Amino acid sequence: MAINAQEISALIKQQIENFKPNFDVTETGVVTYIGDGIARAHGLENAMSGELLNFENGSYGMAQNLESTDVGIIILGDFTDIREGDTIRRTGKIMEVPVGESLIGRVVDPLGRPVDGLGEIHTDKTRPVEAPAPGVMQRKSVSEPLQTGLKAIDALVPIGRGQRELIIGDRQTGKTTIAIDTILNQKDQDMICIYVAIGQKESTVRTQVETLRQYGALDYTIVVTASASQPSPLLFLAPYAGVAMAEEFMYQGKHVLIVYDDLSKQAVAYRELSLLLRRPPGREAFPGDVFYLHSRLLERSAKVSDELGGGSITALPFIETQAGDISAYIATNVISITDGQIFLGDGLFNAGIRPAIDAGSSVSRVGGSAQIKAMKKVAGTLRIDLASYRELEAFTKFGSDLDAATQAKLNRGRRTVEVLKQPVHKPLPVEKQVTILYALTHGFLDTVPVDDIVRFEEEFHAFFDAQHPEILETIRDTKDLPEEAVLDAAITEFLNQSSFQ
């Protein structure tokens, strides 16, 4: 039988082409140190910064320090059963979290795993936790207002969609309450809200979730929680996971409000990780890149251009101060990154002025462009009036005689302070804010006793709802004030019917 060399050659070539190796090549290393949520591994020579690494017990880690001899890894989850000598594998993937509509209404951890006991979250979309912020030409200036429902904020320090507004103050001054009230006010405003709780007690987070559920706000809110009992790596990751979820909606042309409660605890967690990873400490033992920790997070909040869908992420980061010291390291860092700050004063809170917003230290660098026309008209001089009232009030403590003009300013100032007070979880629609502030700035409240202002406001809003809903509708639809004569007549009618004259 003749052997056909060409046939044999063709068969061998075909076999080679069809050959599919069934082995998997992965780079592995050995754990050389484990403790306090940190591991060191030898042998992962090609690991990338931020790469996900897989431990023998199924836990995941994230490469942070790439050194000549080993890799410093933060462990995402339980590290108690990881031992020195265990094998660790590269995955070739960067840390990602699940994103999409199916997360709305759920409470998740920073890895996107549900913690609310309502079953699995079914989504096939993921986004990397670290992503570049939109560039200069991909952004648009902030022009649409984000209504918080709080008179003191919407009138004095307005927030726009796409802005970063820092909320700063001591503990127990009402920071979280402002955030929750703002989320409640986004009902029917076509906004998706993300509340990121960092290093809080689980009981506190539970209370906030129940409040959101009670007022129907969980229907458009995602809660990301890394409680105080969880390892530092999860506290460090939580804000990045939250903003990755927000970016998914922003690039679909939607508007998102994200609250970071609070970034002081994230900075402390990052300091702990950095010291354990043997990075050189700087001021207050924070690592040198603690500014970049927050800047790369907050720069991802933006109003993007129409080519990218015209969506926005509005960020409300929180910083907790010690004894009102806003010149501390982390506080000054975040003040310089954000587009303004709302400072909550301890003294104001204890004096019963709530929300305890210190108008003198608070500022919005977006300002009037984030207000509707009607609000601009009624609140234009409110800030200066309030500041001059505080100054005059300090002088009156000396007990000197006052002229009529000064007395009138003091009287108006006291009524302004009362009008800007607001009960918790009762955000006010912007049209109602405009009517009461109009009455205040046009002198209709000057004869009302200060102690009766709260009751006056309740009856005032009830009167407008019942007798003049068309005025509220005009403000809501046109975003402008109706004719002054119309408003004056309606307020005079209310005063004539009421017992406040």
Swiss-Prot record:
> What's the EC number here?
7.1.2.2
Q: How does it assemble?
A: F-type ATPases have 2 components, CF(1) - the catalytic core - and CF(0) - the membrane proton channel. CF(1) has five subunits: alpha(3), beta(3), gamma(1), delta(1), epsilon(1). CF(0) has three main subunits: a(1), b(2) and c(9-12). The alpha and beta chains form an alternating ring which encloses part of the gamma chain. CF(1) is attached to CF(0) by a central stalk formed by the gamma and epsilon chains, while a peripheral stalk is formed by the delta and b chains.
Q: What is this protein called?
A: ATP synthase subunit alpha
Reactions it catalyzes = ATP + H2O + 4 H(+)(in) = ADP + phosphate + 5 H(+)(out)
Which keywords accompany this UniProt record? ATP synthesis, ATP-binding, Cell membrane, CF(1), Hydrogen ion transport, Ion transport, Membrane, Nucleotide-binding, Translocase, Transport
Q: Tell me, what is one Gene Ontology molecular-function annotation carried by this entry?
A: proton-transporting ATP synthase activity, rotational mechanism
Gene that produces this protein: atpA
Supply the InterPro entries for this chain: ATP_synth_asu-like_sf, ATP_synth_asu_C, ATP_synth_asu_C_sf, ATP_synth_F1_a_nt-bd_dom, ATP_synth_F1_asu, ATPase_F1/V1/A1_a/bsu_N, ATPase_F1/V1/A1_a/bsu_N_sf, ATPase_F1/V1/A1_a/bsu_nucl-bd
Tell me, what does this protein do in biology? Answer: Produces ATP from ADP in the presence of a proton gradient across the membrane. The alpha chain is a regulatory subunit.
Q: Which GO terms describe its cellular component?
A: plasma membrane; proton-transporting ATP synthase complex
Into which family does the record put it?
Answer: Belongs to the ATPase alpha/beta chains family.
Q: Which Gene3D superfamilies match?
A: 2.40.30.20, ATP synthase alpha/beta chain, C-terminal domain, P-loop containing nucleotide triphosphate hydrolases
Q: Topology versus the membrane, per the UniProt entry?
A: Peripheral membrane protein
What SUPFAM superfamilies does this protein map onto?
Answer: C-terminal domain of alpha and beta subunits of F1 ATP synthase, N-terminal domain of alpha and beta subunits of F1 ATP synthase, P-loop containing nucleoside triphosphate hydrolases
- One of its Pfam families is ATP-synt_ab_C
Where does this polypeptide localize? Cell membrane
Q: What is its main location?
A: membrane
Organism's domain of life? Bacteria
Instruction: List residues binding ATP.
Output: 169-176
